[in-house]
Design a protein with these regions (language model features):
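Conserved beta-strand elements of the Class I
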Residues: 4-6
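Short hydrophobic segments within beta-strands
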Residues: 8-11, 35
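NAD(P)-binding Rossmann-fold cofactor-contacting core
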Residues: 15, 22-43
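Short phosphate-binding/catalytic loops that engage adenosine nucleotides
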Residues: 30, 81, 104
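Short acidic low-complexity segments
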Residues: 45-55
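Mid-chain, well-packed structural core segment of small domains
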Residues: 57-93
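Rossmann-fold NAD(P)-binding glycine/threonine-rich loop
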Residues: 88-115
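A charged, well-structured terminal subsegment
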Residues: 117-120
Length: 120
């Protein structure tokens, strides 16, 4: 079984890349949890409006700007995923340093490109 991805910053807006990422992850049979600030669904995935202790998260796919990530630092570190993908525009050296110190892998990449190349 493939491990779960948390899309942090998911949007019900079909024009947003986070929305497309959820759809492509599901198309690739990867379990997805979506977290966002606007209610809705993306394909068959409900957008969670509250944070939970999702123990099964392997990867966080980041779609929050660096300034909006600050309030999630503790949550991300406590969740202790295997990796965090910083999609274009979400790169955050401060959080990357914290991830390094916690031994959490991270990469500046694009979830959609990784999926299209079969490199996810």
């Amino acid at each position: 079984m493939k491990k779960t991805t948390l899309v942090l910053g998911a949007s019900p807006n079909e024009n947003r890349y986070s929305n497309r990422a959820v759809i492509q992850l599901r198309s690739n049979k990867i379990p997805v949890i979506a977290y966002g600030i606007k209610p809705g669904e993306i394909a068959d995935v409900k957008i969670n409006l509250t944070l939970e202790n999702w123990n099964e998260v392997d990867t966080i796919s980041m779609y929050l700007s660096p300034k909006n990530q600050l309030s999630f630092y503790d949550f991300i570190l406590k969740l202790n995923p295997n990796r965090v993908i910083f999609n274009p525009g979400t790169e955050n050296p401060e959080l990357e340093t914290l991830l390094d110190e916690a031994g959490i892998a991270h990469e500046r990449s694009c979830t959609l490109v990784l999926l299209s190349l079969g490199a996810y």
